[in-house]
């Protein structure tokens, strides 16, 4: 079995899922094309990182689908001078994307294990 090509999967996610949902902001598409979504997921779900699915994180929490994350980032219209507060950061992927679009991001997560995993993913 061949290992999954995450780079190709990321490219296809943006071109076949996110962009068709009218996410056309080039900065948002660039961020979603480069930030490794799989790094923010439990190992058991990494092979589904680029599927059009909300994936379980534990504690009854789920990721947003990539198309929803793209729409949210586009709607925020973040500027490089903006400061962002993310409450309920979950796996940290959205905060990571925002961090590449804005000046500073403060992400809060009530579940310690999710916060630690998000911190680790953001440190990579």
Task: Give residue ranges: language-model regions.
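N-terminal auxiliary segments of SAM/dcSAM-dependent transferases
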Residues: 1-44
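A generic secondary-structure micro-motif detector
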Residues: 3-4, 62, 108
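A short alpha-helix capping/helix-coil boundary motif
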Residues: 7-9, 52, 73, 96-100
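Conserved alpha-helix/loop element of class I SAM-dependent methyltransferases that forms part
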Residues: 14-15, 19-20, 49-52, 59, ...
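Alpha-helix N-capping/helix-start residues
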Residues: 25-26, 66, 112
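Glycine-rich loop at the start of a catalytic domain that most often binds anionic cofactors/ligands
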Residues: 44-45, 56
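Conserved nucleotide-cofactor-binding alpha/beta core module
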Residues: 77-124
């Amino acid at each position: 079995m061949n290992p999954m090509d995450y780079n190709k999967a990321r490219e296809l996610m943006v071109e076949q899922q996110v962009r068709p949902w009218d996410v056309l902001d080039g900065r948002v598409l660039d961020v979603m094309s480069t930030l490794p979504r799989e790094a923010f997921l439990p190992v058991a779900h990494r092979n589904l990182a680029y599927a059009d699915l909300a994936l379980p994180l534990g504690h009854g929490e789920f990721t947003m689908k990539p198309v929803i994350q793209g729409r949210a980032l586009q709607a925020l219209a973040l500027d490089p001078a903006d400061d962002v507060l993310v409450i309920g950061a979950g796996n940290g992927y959205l905060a990571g994307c925002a961090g590449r679009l804005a000046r500073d991001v403060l992400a809060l997560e009530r579940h310690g294990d999710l916060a630690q995993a998000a911190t680790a993913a953001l440190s990579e």
